[in-house]
Amino acid sequence: MGAGQSTNTSGHGASPEEMSRILAHRFASKCFTPLELTHLKDNLYSLALKQGDIHYWNEEVLSRFLGIPDGDEKFGLGTLDAGPVIFRMVSYLGAFPFQNTLAPSVLTFDAMVKVIVLLTDRYGKVLRRGKKDRIKLLFGSLADIGRKEASPITSGDKSDNDQGRPETRSDEAGFSVDKPSNDADDYNDDDDLVLAALESLDAIEVFKHDQRIDRTVYEAHISFDTFQRLLMLFVVIAPLQSCEKTSEYFSQLNEESLKPARYCVENILTSFDIGDRTKGIDYETFYWVISTSLPYMFDPLTPLFEHLLFSKNLDLSRRKDSGTCSVSEEKQTKTESYFSPSHPPVILPGSFKPCILDSAVISHLSFFLSTSSPTPNLLQNGTRLHGVFSSDTHGESLTSFSHHVLTWDAPSILLVTGSNSHSSGDEADIITVGAYIPQPWKLPASTSTSHYDTSHQSQLPCLFQLSPRHAVMQGSPSINSLKSNLPVVSFSTKSGIAIGCKIPPPTRTSMDTSRPTPAGSGSLWINPALENAEFFMSNGLSHEEGVFLPPGIARWSPSHPPSKAESETIKISIYNIEVWGVVQTAPTPAQSPYHSRTSTANGDIPDAVARQQANWNFEAREAERRREIHLNVGGGDSEEQSGRALLEMAGIIGDSARRR
């Protein structure tokens, strides 16, 4: 009890600076291994500038170490000038949990410890109550309005004497975005990270005195220019691993290879746009779009800042007198040959040349698509993509589609690109939509029902639009209770390909022209000729049940609630269709549920690519066997007809064989 009372008294009487240092030390001891902490100290102190007894980093040092562009006009208009944006974020996060008083913080060792813990999601080891998302904290670090001038330490200064004296006075004004707007003694329930930090220090009273209720955050905005530069960085380095050199991702870029990245960024920005970009992005729009449509967009920050936990000066794998290269040299060699902007490493060798899928599209998909659990990001969880079908390579026919897609018994991603049927087909009118199908496509005559594990997002389907606007419709949690005429996927030679549509009842009339119709908040229909498609979205106010939830776009966000049901149907003249199989290369604890259809015929083949090839080999052997049987039927026409009739009755040829 004595220790508890002592801590309590210390917490109440300590200044924000002291409490901030205590939290940093607690983060350092709980969230890093001793080896990581040693590497971090070596990196920070070996490159640090010095002002008196204070060692710190400025923007130039931070950008150079992370390997990100800082004031680089190489690619024009500064769209890759992410250094100032990252430095702004870090200066804000380094003041956690006292952003009002201490931000922007000087990037000392204590500040950088907190930054790394927050940006790499390690705070759960200390802050048990903290939310898994950091959206509000990240918004505050990016907001442009009301910031005070940064510390006198500037990135443009060259000598220690000219760097300016770092100050950490608690009576200075911090970011005005964090200034309390009233004097109430309660606090914002959204600040769980801050509250958890202060509770761990027994310093709630300090928090109440320092911040109170923060309402101005809801009035602040992020400029589109700032957000564009950050998005460009994320699109380029999305595949980054902790052991890779960031500079390799930029050294291979040129103006031509950056065009897809810029196009991708513009499409994402459109989902935040409510008509006037000069006002920037407000908090409610930011929170709505990020949480519903871009939940993994900030994931590249984790490997980027984990670079600080590896020091080249302390590389224990070096062998001075060895004739073989070190582990780090092997990693570097692997990294340099592994990444190529023109052919992303996530695509497995042997796949067809993609017309839709490129590095920018893969990065875009990784911002929202969950393909595994507990690590959802497809670029961080070992996911590889295998080319299953391409209309450009395999032809525009449902026969070819069924041959390639229905024999794939693992999750898949469908991509469709084309032009708006009501436009002239200019580049601005190019439309790309798609869907994530977590279970195998079923045969047309299949009567089995699918069951989806709603506890994991990777087990739910997803419908999305990538261009000219980003929109995501996640699978409904009530998907298993939908009626049988609302399947996730329907495939038929008569009605085409339907995703999230309402399927009409079967009819005996050969002239029946009924086709799947839109349902719920989103659907995609492709006609049997694979020439046209219809992409449907609604704001969900019609309350019609369906496979997908409403899209998270700005114009239908809670901050701009529509007064009535709204929907949008885009008619697409198709250019290309691609289906990419999802292959998990990382070991998973549980056996994959996608083996049942081929396990009896081909044995328990663990790899989806091998299982598909085994299916094709089996079909080829059966075709050869049928051909030999047909050739062995001798005699005249009557005997040939009798033999054919026997084969049809046995189900080897004819309609019954096709339905098997």
Swiss-Prot record:
Its main location: cytoplasm. It is found in: Cytoplasm. Keywords: Cytoplasm. PROSITE patterns: TLDC. Residues 150-187 are annotated as: Disordered. It comes from the Eukaryota. One of its GO terms (cellular component) is cytoplasm. Residues 355-583 form the TLDc domain. Residues 157-172 have a biased composition (Basic and acidic residues). May be involved in a process influencing telomere capping. Belongs to the RTC5 family. This is Restriction of telomere capping protein 5. It comes from Trichophyton verrucosum (strain HKI 0517). The gene is RTC5.
